[in-house]
Design a protein with these regions (language model features):
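Conserved RNA-binding domains used in RNP assembly and mRNA/RNA metabolism
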Residues: 1-59
């Protein structure tokens, strides 16, 4: 699943550090709009960058 497709859905994200985050995905920001050039999304109350997410799926 692409990161932008998760926006507005409850998701399960497997992070590169081994943690798993479950929550509503919101506020997708493309790499073009991020200062560091890496897309991001809010899941629950945390902000995650695309390079921190190993995989993401609908919950």
């Amino acid at each position: 699943m692409k990161l932008w497709e998760a926006d507005g859905h409850k998701v399960i994200a497997h992070l590169t550090n081994g943690h798993v985050v479950v929550g509503m995905a919101d506020c997708y920001t493309s790499e073009q709009d991020e200062p560091d050039g890496v897309a991001s999304i809010i899941i629950g109350d945390g902000l995650f960058f695309e390079n921190q997410i190993e995989s993401i799926e609908l919950a």
